[in-house]
Amino acid sequence: MASSRAQRFNPIAFTPWPVTCITTIVYLALLIPILVINLVVPSAPETNPKGVNLTEAWRDLQHLTGGFHPYNSRRNDEVHEWLLSRINSIIRPTVEAGQRSSATDNLPEVFVFDDNRSNLTYSNGGVGKTSIVGVYFESTNIIVYIRGSEDDLENWWERSNGKPKGKGGVLVNAHYDSVSTGYGATDDGIGVVSLLQLLRYFTTPGNNPRKGLVLLFNNGEEDYLNGAHVFSQHPLSNFTHTFLNLEGAGAGGRAALFRTTDTEVTRFYGNTKHPFGSVLAADGFKMGLLRSQTDYVVFNGILGLRGLDLAFIAPRSRYHTDQDDTRHTSIDSLWHMLSASIGTTEGLVSYTGMDFDGKSKDQNKVNSGAGTLGVWFDMFGTAFAVFRLHTLFAISVALLVIAPLVIFVTNRMYLFSMSKSLEGTGDQVSLRGLRGFSRTPIILVTATTIPICLAYLLEKVNPYIVHSSQFSVWSMMFSAWIFLAWFLACAADFFRPSALHRAYSYTWIFIATWIMLVINTVYANQKGIAAGYFLLFYFAGAFLATWISYLELFALPRKGDFARQTTGRRPSSLSSRLLTSSADELRSNASPSTAEFPGAAGEDTDPTESTSLLRGQRTTFANYRTSGPGGAAEETDEREDINKGGTFEHEQSWSWTLPRWTWVLQLLLLAPIVLILVGQLALFLTASMCQVGSDGVSTFVVYLACAVFTTLLCIPLFPLIHRFTYHIPTFLFLVFIGTLIYNLVAFPFSPANRLKTFFIQEVDLDNGSNTVSLTGIQPYLTDAINSIPSAAGQNITCDKTTPFGKLERCSWSGLSPNVLGQGRERDTEIVPDKWITYNITKTVGKNKARIEISGRNTRACKLKFDRAVANFQVSGSAVDHRMPPTSRQGVAEIRLWSRTWENTWVVDINWHESADESDDDDDDDEKHDAPQNVLSGKAICMWSDANQPGVIPALDEVRLYAPSWIAISKAADGLVEASHSFTIQ
């Protein structure tokens, strides 16, 4: 009998060891590649592709990031001149070849515009009754135009009011300014050197663009998207219809596509070899969950261009800090963005269709046509899926209707059946078909509650551990969910075993995903939200897995046949010992011997011509051969085989004919699609959000997202988990204990994952006070300040009056800054006239005034008012009706930026007598002289150049003495702000 049992071993049977091994292999085979994709950047090619020089690009990046280069710094001017030199060196061979060639049609014309003329006054538009911020900015953008082979040959921009003809061109944008506290390797140095390589690529013979290509090296993005705004005043802004914006919101890794305008333009990103990104991030912006903005909002929202946002998203702890340098990124990251830029741009400039040249609905925007909302995501970093949101909606509606109908019309047989009545006698035969029906929702809710409780626990005890240990958090939640679900499922199976556990589990999963898909479909239709696209595939997999469970039931005998057989009323020729019920399933008075072996008496008949060669045997739906009732000599041993090869342990006896391999098919239909789509989303989300706590965002959102995604990823395991052996759950329980202890007691920051704090030094020129402030999260902020020598022994004042959520701002009297430039006296004493000069002239009898302001060794100042002014105008400024400088809310602050150092701005302002009055230049003199006509505020200038040690000693001191797990970033436009108070009456 041993050899017989060995032959019956099935490596894919629904028994503990096959289930444990196969399920583990499937999950590891999918999760490991997903982890690799999110953690490892594809290698750059060893040899340069045609038209690209990666070595040159890396050297350019190293030069660009040799110092801090914010707009308000001398090094920014050096970078500007260096870029012009690099551009000219790249296009020089093309220009010289064109001059020597008689057939210049094959060589693209290249035009370089050093835009030092454009300026603009605009505002942020305001929200509700909030006063807006007005901005005046002078351009230092560099614009390169590569004429396409199908472009108008006329230099139309040289004519006044000249307009382009033909199809619109393509804009690729990156900003060459950095923040004052970061070297800007990924924000946005890689974008800048990618533009240089795009220039080289499209001026290489054979790579000529069909449509014109505009490369915008914009300056001033970090402070208020100023460079993109002022680009709107250049003639080429009317030529481009599509765009690709290169950005950085992290400091390395892969460049992610995290926002696009429509389906049609997104398809061109599919040309890249290593796509990466999801529509989830785009919907985060749409729903207001992500508040930081890029030049994308200017190109699309104001100019009406259609395009894509490509950016680095992690790690945010290095973003805007001194670790955003070439040491902490790689040539692989550079190649990932560059290759995506080349693939996308090449597709856009080669496109000959009319999708991007239709009439615009807004006459103030370019005629770029109208796109459709899209759904897009990558798969394993090698394939890219993109389709219309309307397609998602239509398929979702169809599946929501068809799937339940298919399930409903499929014969459920033993499902939901407790017993079967015998015809004629009325006897009830127990089927136990409802056993296992209610356990799934109870266990799933319990298992899901645990990660949510853990999220609350971490938020209360150690809220920032995810900052440096996101995978420890993931491991804790995964192990807790799986162990608890396994324990409860095994307990339920022990006390009430059921062969229908899998069918009921898939049914509940089907119901839950159906509800979620309904909600997602409503949001997709009404709000245009596509982030739940994975639910369509999740539901489709759940539907197919559920349907298979229902189709399995066709392998069972009919309930009536089983009932008659258990009471001995079926003919012996149709009977089988393997359909025997246990004693507690029989509610009739039939004798056990008759019920168990109803055909024993008539089995030894003589064979005839019609007798089967496999006499006494039958084949089940699962292709298991079972013996019929043979001789009494082997009855005991054969009964033992039946128990091992038929029903599993104490499950319903009618279940022996159920297929034993279909669980593998169900696993493969549901688990891979869930792991691929949901797994990538989970890692993408946590990688981009795990370090937002240092920005004042609640980390509970991150932990809650981990808990939800843990459940979504583990649900495909649940129908099978009661068959697991104890080995893996026990191991995971130990993992849970270890990671829980670590997550509760470990210090959340490290030199590789630093806590970001925000620095500013404010000098009050009225009283000579000098205040240094750091903004961050407590109690870590206090620990950092206690390590600073100049703060020792001082009364540190802290408050939460910041716009950054949970952050606190702590201040003390700091070291005096030396920002007035070389050749001037050291600023050990605050002399107001050396810092800012300003003059205010009020118009007699009116609520009008002219303010002249200038700062020493700076080109950035601002005016802040205690109450909003109605209107303002900067002398010599252009105004664009698409971006009005004021609104009915009024202007509370005016920011002034100049391309010229120590420039004097002349600003005319007027203000209302009260918040309810409209502007009226003919108001009575008595009203204007009344106290309510008094306007007070501050004249402020800013300094942002920290390249030389000793210029801002307080900043040098913080960097030198702060703990290694502290990073310093800017708190405002300037590192140092000096202010004068004024009153106009």
Curated annotation (Swiss-Prot):
- For the Cytoplasmic compartment, the record's topological domain ranges are 1-20, 410-440, 492-502, 549-666, 722-727
Name the active site residues: E221 (proton acceptor)
Q: Where is this region: Disordered?
A: 563-612
Kindly give the membrane topology term recorded for this protein.
Answer: Multi-pass membrane protein
Query: What does this chain do?
Result: May be involved in vacuolar sorting and osmoregulation.
Query: Any idea which positions bind Zn(2+) 1?
Result: H175, D187, E247
Name the family.
Belongs to the peptidase M28 family.
* Cellular component annotations (GO), alphabetically ordered: vacuolar membrane
What's the protein here called? Answer: Vacuolar membrane protease
- Glycan attachment sites: N53, N116, N119, N238, N767, N795, N839
Q: Where is this site: Transition state stabilizer?
A: Y319
Which terms are listed as keywords in the entry? Glycoprotein, Hydrolase, Membrane, Metal-binding, Metalloprotease, Protease, Transmembrane, Transmembrane helix, Vacuole, Zinc
What Gene Ontology molecular function terms does this protein carry? metal ion binding; metalloexopeptidase activity
Origin organism lineage: Eukaryota, Fungi, Dikarya, Ascomycota, Pezizomycotina
Describe cofactor binding as the record notes it: Binds 2 Zn(2+) ions per subunit.
User: Where is the protein situated, by its record's location annotation?
Assistant: Vacuole membrane
Task: Report whether Ligase shows up as a keyword of the record.
Answer: no
The protein's Enzyme Commission number: 3.4.-.-
Q: Which residues bind Zn(2+) 2?
A: D187, E222, H320
